[in-house]
Amino acid sequence: MGGSTSKNSFKNTTNIISNSIFNQMQSCISMLDGKNYIGVFGDGNILNHVFQDLNLSLDTSCVQKHVNKENFITNLSNQITQNLKDQEVALTQWMDAGHHDQKTDIEENIKVNLTTTLIQNCVSSLSGMNVLVVKGNGNIVENATQKQSQQIISNCLQGSKQAIDTTTGITNTVNQYSHYTSKNFFDFIADAISAVFKNIMVAAVVIVLIIVGFIAVFYFLHSRHRHEEEEEAEPLISNKVLKNAAVS
């Protein structure tokens, strides 16, 4: 989505990562009802629009097995970049001289910083109960929602330096590419054309080398065949000369 001027915030990136982790772990999570708890103590308290999500049951052995799969980080990276695209964040995949693009930068960031141990710990933090306690008199609680899923994972990620490094890196990468394509649109086009031109030139050189190789092989085979014909012709000439001499 080149040319987008949208800025991706640290909070938004954290939510995207936590949502992606949750989605990747859904096979290990089942919903359980009846474990959430709301306690209201005191007089004159008013609660309006207070909701609780269903609690979660987590299979920790499933989580451990899942995060250690060879393609887990790759799938997670794909999920994150797809979520970035879905939220109208500039994901340009413009090419530089080294053929690196935004998605590659994000993948490398995740592989370096977002370890399977960290992911496993944050997903495991889903276990337990949601508790909302209101004490005292005259309290007003409105539009309170307890979320036990992406938000808990998000809070866990914000407490880890590695996760913060990942989130910061992805945010900066997205904003960097977004700024590049929006503020330097013609430079972006020029770079893309230049990259394509370089690829064409490389392909042309390869084709020329292949043609030269074919010519060299053809010349070698042709010369060899001609040399063999000359060698076969020499005895015939000699025999003809001898016959002529004998007749004379």
Curated annotation (Swiss-Prot):
Q: What sections of the protein cross the membrane?
A: 200-220
Q: Where is the lipid attached (N-myristoyl glycine)?
A: G2
Q: Give residue spans on the Extracellular membrane side.
A: 221-248
The terms describing its cellular component in GO are: host cell membrane; membrane; viral inner membrane; virion membrane
* Primary location: host cell
Q: Which residues lie on this side of the membrane: Cytoplasmic?
A: 2-199
Keywords, in A-Z order? Capsid inner membrane protein, Host membrane, Lipoprotein, Membrane, Myristate, Signal-anchor, Transmembrane, Transmembrane helix, Virion
Which InterPro entries does the UniProt record give?
Answer: Virion_mem_poxvirus_L1
Q: What Pfam families does the record point to?
A: L1R_F9L (PF02442)
The disulfides recorded in the entry are: none
State the annotated membrane topology for this chain: Single-pass type II membrane protein
Q: Which domain of life is it from?
A: Viruses
| Cellular location(s) | Host membrane; Virion membrane
Which family does the record claim for this protein?
Belongs to the asfivirus E248R family.
What this chain does, per the record? Answer: Essential for viral fusion with host endosomal membrane and core release.
Q: How does it assemble?
A: Interacts with A151R.
What is the recorded name of this protein?
A: Inner membrane protein pE248R
